[in-house]
Amino acid sequence: MAVVPIRIVGDPVLHTPTEPVPVGPDGSLPDDLPALIQDMFDTMDAANGVGLAANQIGVAKRLFVYDCAPTRGQTTRRRGVVINPVLETSEVPETMPDPDEDEEGCLSVPGENFPTGRADWARVTGLDADGSPITLEGEDLFARMLQHETGHLDGFLYLDRLVGRYARAAKKAVKRNGWGVPGLSWMPGEVPDPFGH
């Protein structure tokens, strides 16, 4: 399959809710879905990401892939795909995000990280690559990833969740980088890793 360009903040596909992946009466999934899923894994891996939503590569369908440790610093990772995810979370704290504990990045905002308030626990239900029901649940980094990727599919970037000085810093970063306009992307493997992995 292939590594494909990742869309950058400002591309309309990132700011529009995605469409559910059609499921046949017999539970079958579209014939072209395995190729899309493989492209997503290839692209996420080339970018050293922990997750990638379909709209980040320009496909407005409701699915994401992940390769994420349960908590920061762990080397054991969970890897898979969720089709048509539905998110459930604990309450999001109303305090300012901690600059050390709550830092978050995004492949569609390459090289930037900002503290982002998220729920401590999250669960996603949906379908796996075979169309079988799947439930993923986690805390810490895994919960953050579930919320981040599902947010993409709802048409939001983590920048939309930022508050106070973090929101102002993100707005300046978008302007400084010339982002916020349609048509921008970057190609993992062809440019230096924007996060320095």
Swiss-Prot record:
Pfam families: Pep_deformylase. Signal peptide: none annotated. It catalyses: N-terminal N-formyl-L-methionyl-[peptide] + H2O = N-terminal L-methionyl-[peptide] + formate. Coiled coil: none annotated. The active site is at E149. Its cofactor is Fe(2+). NCBIfam families: pept_deformyl, PRK00150.1-3, PRK12846.1-4. Removes the formyl group from the N-terminal Met of newly synthesized proteins. Requires at least a dipeptide for an efficient rate of reaction. N-terminal L-methionine is a prerequisite for activity but the enzyme has broad specificity at other positions. This is Peptide deformylase.
